């Protein structure tokens, strides 16, 4: 058994030529490294036609004579979208899905002891009769060999697949499939715990290996405990010869039990409130072609920075490296068959069914995967077709429920969970539809598979009022999905901005739907998610202020609303070192169902009128209310406030003078506002809003050590305003 990473030494042509597959090739080719995209696109104003092409890859290699009599397998992690593989001019394999892995047996075409050539005909055109193509698509699909490639040398008989069903109580079943002559062979399985303890089990090929491991630590969101299963295919020795290990396969897994009922999702018997985001697997410039480190970083951002406990892989199975990271972090994954809205003819459907099978077989050992998407996202009902997708998935994995994202009510429910794209919120009233009005079967599970960004696109450089509205919309739906009984949770649309086709987006080929931009920089709405995390130390405290407090940047110089997104116990506000007020979350207000409701800053005056105007406490409080109302309502006053002015013997000029002295900036220096997050009685984080005196930026390097390993590597560098923490 030998394994080789095969991501170097490839040659690329943007225009496929049949000469590419021949042993000798005089074509002018470009050296490339895998992962590779067929066309690097600009960040915006790109043209989707540029990556739609029939292109080719070629790699020469030497096949030593030691490989003769063995099986040589070449595995592609993903090729977008239609791939035909040749070896020494022979067509060996065709694969019609750009989102799943496939393996090609090169053995019969190899010339041992000689140079050999593998070539790939890669078709990334969008007129292919395979998912997701056939209709309009609200995302770009890119092209190329964009996931890793590997070569394995095995015996003629080998393990093709290993699958373990492992319940939270410790019961397990191990299923295997083999290739080649295996008569008389046996199986040996070993389960290794995180502590290093091992348990061995023997079995026959015809039956699953079953058993119970005592004292297991179940995989959960808080404690994502991973075990390792190693299965060996053994040919017993004869004539006094020892047993021979023909093949060995190792997978990671977790003991856990998933159940969806009318009351929600239960993981290991404990109810979980899903708080997730949808993730496209694309990035700026390179499309799908990113190394494992960046795929893993997305999972870390979702779990550690945004505080999510779940992610939906829109709208396809995604990188194994991403799923590995989700396993390690405790991030639940709702993955789905490739496609968007369109259902094609019978040829298209046959490929879609194959995609479902490949998705399940390639992802089912990941404990983070808790839900299969058995429908094309947003598509119409198709009873015959969706009966087949559900049957195919359940046959390969009876342990997980199925779902399918819909964009209409009372859809035929063949799955275990009704997943609904709820874009009903328009900024007022209920933020999500009543579950009973949407699902045809309230006895089954229900979740919101999309909401938010699509209905209120927000650019990172939009004005603060626009950015605040998006953030509060996300908060409203999160709140109402928690408050409504029977809703298992929600997946906001979406994690990050993404490139799209001309029919969608903001006219520049970008959908600005994310809580992050395309480079994973946070928008204000990211703080809605991040602030829902439970703080265990001061470093976990989030403090994000919606307003820059720069009146000169606002229409008419009229202040906008100011909200703070935080998981602290309270927030203290200071103006030029004068304490204004301390604000706590409103546990009975609009966002009361959230673990950490956003806090509206409603008082910018506090006791300043006592200190500087000589007012008694009662008069100062009444006058402060008038000034805060003027700030909130663009200098307009209610009849009640006008009556209070009379009782305080204040004229309009008096009120205007105090307004500009304590809230506005006319005639005086711009104030400095300081917001402090209070946690366990102490200020642990600070945000200061003041006119810029000097530019000071903080550089954060994600993945700072680049590793030229199985593939090329990349760092993500964020430049931002420094974070201030208050010494404790």
Give the residues covered by each predicted segment.
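Accessory beta-strand-rich segments of carbohydrate-active enzymes
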Residues: 3-16, 37, 47-48, 52-159, ...
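Beta-strand-rich binding/interaction modules
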Residues: 87, 171-203, 560-582, 673-677
């Amino acid at each position: 058994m030998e394994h080789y990473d095969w991501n170097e030494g490839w040659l690329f042509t943007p225009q496929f030529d049949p000469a590419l597959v021949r042993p000798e090739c005089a074509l002018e080719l470009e050296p490339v490294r895998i992962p590779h995209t067929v066309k690097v696109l600009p960040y915006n104003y790109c043209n989707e036609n540029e990556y739609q092409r029939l292109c080719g890859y070629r790699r020469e290699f030497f096949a030593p004579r030691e490989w003769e009599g063995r099986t040589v397998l070449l595995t592609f992690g993903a090729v977008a979208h239609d791939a035909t593989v040749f070896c020494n001019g022979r067509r060996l394999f065709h694969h019609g899905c750009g989102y799943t892995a496939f393996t090609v047996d090169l053995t019969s075409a190899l010339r041992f002891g000689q140079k050999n050539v593998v070539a790939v005909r890669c078709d990334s055109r969008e007129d292919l009769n395979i998912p997701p193509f056939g209709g309009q698509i609200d995302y770009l699909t890119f092209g190329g060999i964009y996931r890793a490639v590997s070569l394995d040398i095995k015996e003629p008989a080998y393990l093709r697949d290993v699958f373990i069903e492992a319940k939270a109580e410790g019961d397990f079943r191990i299923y295997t499939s083999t290739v080649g002559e295996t008569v008389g062979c046996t199986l040996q399985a070993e389960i290794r715990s995180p502590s290093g303890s091992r348990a061995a089990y023997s079995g026959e090929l015809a039956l699953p290996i079953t058993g119970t491991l005592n004292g297991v630590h179940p995989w959960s969101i808080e404690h994502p405990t991973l075990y390792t299963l190693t299965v060996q295919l053994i040919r017993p020795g004869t004539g006094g010869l020892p047993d021979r290990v023909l093949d060995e396969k190792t997978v990671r897994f977790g003991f856990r039990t998933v159940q969806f009922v009318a009351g929600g999702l239960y993981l290991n018997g404990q109810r979980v409130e899903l708080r997730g985001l949808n993730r496209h697997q694309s990035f700026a410039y390179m499309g799908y072609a990113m190394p494992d480190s960046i795929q893993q970083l997305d999972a870390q951002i979702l779990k550690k920075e945004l505080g999510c406990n779940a992610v939906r892989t829109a709208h396809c199975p995604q990188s194994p490296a991403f799923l590995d990271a989700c396993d390690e972090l405790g991030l639940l994954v709702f993955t789905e068959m490739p496609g968007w809205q369109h259902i094609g003819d019978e040829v298209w459907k046959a490929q879609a069914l194959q995609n479902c099978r490949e998705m399940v077989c390639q992802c089912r050992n990941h404990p983070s995967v808790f839900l299969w998407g058995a429908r094309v996202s947003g598509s119409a009902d198709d009873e015959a077709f969706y009966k087949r997708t559900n049957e195919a998935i359940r046959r390969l994995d009876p342990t997980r429920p199925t779902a399918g994202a819909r964009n209409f009510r009372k859809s035929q429910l063949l799955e275990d969970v009704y997943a609904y794209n709820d874009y009903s919120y328009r900024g007022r009233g209920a933020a999500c539809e009543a579950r009973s009005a949407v699902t045809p079967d309230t006895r089954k599970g229900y979740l919101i598979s999309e909401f938010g960004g699509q209905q209120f696109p927000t650019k990172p450089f939009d004005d603060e009022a626009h950015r605040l509205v998006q953030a509060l919309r996300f908060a409203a739906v999160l709140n109402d999905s928690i408050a409504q009984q029977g809703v298992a949770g929600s997946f906001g649309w979406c994690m990050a901005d993404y490139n799209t086709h001309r029919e969608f987006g903001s006219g520049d080929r970008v959908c600005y739907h994310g809580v992050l931009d395309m480079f994973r920089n946070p928008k204000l709405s990211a703080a809605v998610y991040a602030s829902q995390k439970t703080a265990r130390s001061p470093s976990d405290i989030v403090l994000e202020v919606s307003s820059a407090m720069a009146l000169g940047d606002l229409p008419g110089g009229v202040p906008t609303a100011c909200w703070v997104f935080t998981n602290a116990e309270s927030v203290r506000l200071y103006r030029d070192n004068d304490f204004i007020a301390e604000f706590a979350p409103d546990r009975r207000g609009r966002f009361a169902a959230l673990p950490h409701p956003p806090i509206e800053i409603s008082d910018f005056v506090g006791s300043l009128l006592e200190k500087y105007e000589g007012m008694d406490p009662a008069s100062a409080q009444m006058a402060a209310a008038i000034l805060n109302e003027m700030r909130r309502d663009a200098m307009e006053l209610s009849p009640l406030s006008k009556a209070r002015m009379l009782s305080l013997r204040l004229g309009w000029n008096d009120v205007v003078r105090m307004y500009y002295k304590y809230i506005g900036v006319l005639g005086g220096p711009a104030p400095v506002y300081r917001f402090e997050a209070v946690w366990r009685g102490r200020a642990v984080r600070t945000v200061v809003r003041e006119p810029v005196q000097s530019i000071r930026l903080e550089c954060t390097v994600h993945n700072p050590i680049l590793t030229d390993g199985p593939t090329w590597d990349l760092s993500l560098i964020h430049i931002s305003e420094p974070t201030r923490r208050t010494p404790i």
